[in-house]
């Protein structure tokens, strides 16, 4: 699922064809693995590695256990609270912003920041950053926006990861 990351985080500072994985653990803190991820060399290396694994009928193990028997103990992404970036176009009507705030409040979503830009064709782009909430609450609000007469088109919602 696409998301936004702070530009001050290791992931936010990536440039070019570099790939990165950020791992966090209680005992070790943050571990960052970074390496080439695009271009002729890295792609050829990955393809060759896959061909070798297929030829060897590789069935890898993790910590001495078959990888397919390991169970993930993490909650579904939709259940992990996070801040969200919302972008929508509001019709130029009295009470439009109040209606948006009411819909978010009814869905259990709290607004951290909001910004409205100049009008274009009787509509104004509005950007909202929420406090931490679940994707289910965001989806509830998005569905409710469709029933209002103040939101023009489909709003966009992107998760903001803290890494």
Language-model region placement:
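A conserved regulatory-domain signal marking ACT and ACT-like small-molecule sensing domains
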Residues: 46, 51-163
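Solvent-exposed residues in well-ordered beta-strands and their adjoining turns
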Residues: 3-5, 24-26, 89-91, 131
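C-terminal substrate-binding/catalytic lobe of Rossmann-fold NAD(P)-dependent oxidoreductases
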Residues: 1-18
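A short, polar/proline- and glycine-enriched secondary-structure boundary/capping micro-motif
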Residues: 10-11, 42-46
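Glycine-rich, aromatic-lined ligand/substrate-binding cores of catalytic
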Residues: 14-28
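Glycine-rich, flexible loop/turn motifs
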Residues: 10, 29, 73
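Glycine-rich phosphate/pyrophosphate-binding beta-alpha loops
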Residues: 5-7, 29-31, 35-41
């Amino acid at each position: 699922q696409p998301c936004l990351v702070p530009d001050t985080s290791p992931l936010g500072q990536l440039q070019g064809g570099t790939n990165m994985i950020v791992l966090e653990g209680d005992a070790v803190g943050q571990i960052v693995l970074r390496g080439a991820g695009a271009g002729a060399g890295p792609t050829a290396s990955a393809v060759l590695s896959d061909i070798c694994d297929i030829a060897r009928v590789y069935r890898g193990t993790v910590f001495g256990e078959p990888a397919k028997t390991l169970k993930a103990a993490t909650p579904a992404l939709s259940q992990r609270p996070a801040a969200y970036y919302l972008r929508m176009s509001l019709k130029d009507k009295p009470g439009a912003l109040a209606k948006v705030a009411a819909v978010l409040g009814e869905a259990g979503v709290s607004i951290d920041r909001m910004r409205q830009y100049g009008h274009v064709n009787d509509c104004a782009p509005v950007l909202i950053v929420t406090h931490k909430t679940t994707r289910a609450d965001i989806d509830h609000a998005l569905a409710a926006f469709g029933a209002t007469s103040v939101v023009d088109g489909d709003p966009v919602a992107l998760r903001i990861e803290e890494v």
